């Protein structure tokens, strides 16, 4: 485990900007080019890991805000980034302007296509297969037989050296004017793109309705429409969407491994998507 002395900051120099599942964001009161993300109390290694990965991702040429210092306010730890002024996430944009949903979905799909066509240094990042295999071992809610089937599915996925965001959903993609950025890259790696696309599908068809409303600022039906506009642009219009969904759904179900770990209990809604793997 890497250690690094965190720079002490005065939170009075920052103003609240928003929050997500892992922490709270702030903007610097006196420097408009600096923003801060502080993780929940007790999380130290996670923000350090995110900073290190974000720096590697930035240096690899992936469009993402430039990371700065590892910091603490005395209770929480986090990272300073270059602030992208006037930026909007695709989730917020769809929630505020659903009449532009198709355009936003198409732009996000093109971002994802470019990301998944980007070759990366495989010595610098974790293979997505290795990540899921490791997390599967740590999940206490699957039987040994279920773990065997899931592991076989994971390992049978094609091998590629192209970029994987790791938490690919439209709240983690920003735009301002013609510029586009990915954020929250703590799980960045490389591998088969459907491990990523499964998350986009999950936000439409698997995530709990209240979670969609809170995290993505839209009604569940709107998230379904977003997926239906996204899929033909990402996969091409020559494939029926039902065939696309049949291929993607098991990868969406793999999020069960992570969600159950975080929630500390089995998640039947997510497990439903694993039926093609567990009960072929």
Tell me what each language-model feature is.
Residues 1-5, 117-166, 170-171, 176:
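An alpha-helical support segment within catalytic cores of ATP-dependent transferases
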Residues 1-7, 265-280:
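Regulatory N- and C-terminal appendages and interdomain linkers associated
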Residues 8-16:
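Conserved N-terminal boundary motif of the eukaryotic protein kinase catalytic domain
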Residues 15-121:
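ATP-binding pocket architecture of kinase catalytic cores
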Residues 33, 78, 161-163, 180, ...:
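Hydrophobic "anchor" residues on beta-strands that sit immediately upstream
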Residues 171-197:
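Catalytic activation segment of kinase domains across protein kinase-like and atypical kinase folds
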Residues 197-238, 252-268:
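Active-site activation/catalytic loop segments of kinase-like enzymes and analogous catalytic loops
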Residues 237-248:
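Short, surface-exposed acidic
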